[in-house]
Amino acid sequence: MTGPGELAGSRPVDAHLENGAGIDVVLVTGLSGAGRGTAAKVLEDLGWYVADNLPPQLITRMVDLGMDAGSRITQLAVVMDVRSRGFTGDLDSVRTELATRNIAPRVVFMEASDDMLVRRYEQNRRSHPLQGDQTLAEGIAAERRMLAPVRATADLIIDTSTLSVRALRETIERAFGGGANATISVTVESFGFKYGLPMDADMVMDVRFLPNPHWVDELRPRTGQDPAVRDYVLGQPGAAEFLDAYHRLLSLVVDGYRREGKRYMTVAIGCTGGKHRSVAIAEALMQRLQAQHGEAQLSVRVLHRDLGRE
């Protein structure tokens, strides 16, 4: 049994492959219950395009789509169902086909000890895919034998027996990018409280403490994107101080998200109708975040959920 994240082949996995095709391909395989799904989620958080349980014969077609002009797919991770008959031969065929495209895919094999796999299946009250009328232990043993040739040719073997989810994330980040320098995607979303709270918000801030431009006749029909409304909102007492303080708070939260391996954050800014104050503040906050953090560290976008709803 290997240690967590042991390199199985001679090819380094912690460096981006200089594939002539311009697309990096990772094939995630391994024992059922060893964490393939978790590994796929981490890769997705790192910006990889993830295809789950894609049949081997469709992998090259997916790669061809990624190589098409205009495609934004530069990193493709495929989670493969390795239990199908003839899988080892299929995997070899995929590697051969990709080699003709000047692509050398990396194979990640997820495994765990028999005791740990038994414990996980018992905790989830699920049967093993190969168990049939056998015992759970026999099903695990059968799959381990079936996948031995795949394991022997893997580029990276990750034993999750003693790994927490966080430790598994760190292992994958070290191999495939991310970690302390990973990009975090932040959505700054304006909304109106009268339409309800955003369900996907990680943080919610109420800016109804600022005077409402709705009560200024010449500003009422305009929105927070209008320079006159923006200047009115940002020029109010406390507005600049609020932006300074909330920006500092968000910077602390972003640093914490990065340490915890989280890659997505939604910050919701609310006012009464989501038309004036929240829009202006959300735009200003987005600009501050973009100015402080480079695009390589923080990807920021603004979303005005209720703009135009009146």
From Swiss-Prot:
The keyword ATP-binding applies. It comes from Mycolicibacterium paratuberculosis (strain ATCC BAA-968 / K-10) (Mycobacterium paratuberculosis). SUPFAM superfamilies: P-loop containing nucleoside triphosphate hydrolases. This is Nucleotide-binding protein MAP_1147. HAMAP family: RapZ_like (MF_00636). Keywords: ATP-binding, GTP-binding, Nucleotide-binding. It comes from the Bacteria. GTP binds at residues 81-84. ATP binds at residues 30-37. The keyword NAD does not apply. PANTHER family: RNASE ADAPTER PROTEIN RAPZ. Pfam families: PapZ_C (PF22740), RapZ-like_N (PF03668).
